[in-house]
Amino acid sequence: MKAAISLIIFFAILFVVIEAISYEEGKELFQKERAECVGDGQRCADWAGPYCCSGYYCSCRSMPYCRCRSDSGK
């Protein structure tokens, strides 16, 4: 019985450690992506980057000249 409880506790701790590591990696990737964004009127490509910063969307009125536009003007 003690072995089963110990095994359950071991796997619970292992799960928590794995989740903490994957959360930190995801957070780091998100911050890196936000640092490489472009602003209003700059060239963008939603499918491959560079991506528009928060508050902007990629508008492709004439391919391949896509530009970041403000979300407020939609």
Swiss-Prot record:
Signal peptide boundaries: 1-20
Entry's localization field: Secreted
Propeptide: 21-34
Keywords, in A-Z order: Amidation, Disulfide bond, Ion channel impairing toxin, Knottin, Neurotoxin, Presynaptic neurotoxin, Secreted, Signal, Toxin, Voltage-gated sodium channel impairing toxin
Annotated GO MF terms: sodium channel regulator activity; toxin activity
A family per Pfam: Toxin_7
Record-level GO cellular component terms: extracellular region; host cell presynaptic membrane
Residue ranges that the Swiss-Prot or TrEMBL entry lists as coiled coil: none
Disulfide partners: C37-C53, C44-C58, C52-C68, C60-C66
This protein's record includes keyword Secreted: yes
Domain of life: Eukaryota
Domain notes: The presence of a 'disulfide through disulfide knot' structurally defines this protein as a knottin.
The protein's name: U3-agatoxin-Ao1b
Originating organism: Agelena orientalis (Funnel-web spider)
